[in-house]
Amino acid sequence: MLDIKQNRRAMKYSSGEMSRRVLWMFVQPLFRFSPRPCFGWRRLLLRSLGAKIGRNVHIYPSATIYFPWNLEAGDESAIGEYAFIYNLGRITIGARATISHRAHLCAGTHDHTKSDFPLLRPPITIGAEAWVCADAFVGPGVTIGEGAIVGAGSIVMKDVKPWMIVIGNPARESKRREITQ
């Protein structure tokens, strides 16, 4: 039987994390209400709270970032409108990767096999030049390979090979991504 009472009493965050969460609560309105083209301002705010943000990264003001200090975004990557970055664990987004409109990256879960239901924080890695399309969900501990595409609305709970396109719920391989030019 689950011991929910024990879970609710468990210390899930260190005092340092709690302090940073409170600071982020005060800074977040400066992020959220900044004009849409002010990408540099939002990069500065996130960096000031420990995020590792590369050059020319576009993060839109309506994106939700849970723990800035657990975010790494490579050069020229993008986090789109209303994307939800639930980064209890580290989330790494490679150079020129795109997290589209309303995509959800979830680097947190619970161990359902233990009675106290402890919090787990498996990291997520999005490879360089990968694309997580609109309304897609990427679960805890998943790696999306370089150049891979997660189709719109897909649910990804397993690693995706480099340059592979996955679609559906659960996500399954559709075909290999080919770049023509």
Q: How should these model regions be labeled?
A:
Residues 134-158:
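Beta-rich strand-turn-strand
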Residues 34-43, 63-73, 78-143, 169-170, ...:
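Flexible, glycine/small-residue-enriched loop-and-beta-strand segment within the central core
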Residues 1-51, 55-56, 96, 129, ...:
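Terminal amphipathic alpha-helical/low-complexity segments used for targeting or macromolecular assembly
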Residues 166:
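Conserved active-site beta-strand element of glycosyltransferases/polysaccharide synthases
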Residues 54, 112, 155-158, 172:
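Short, electropositive, low-hydrophobicity segments enriched in small/polar residues
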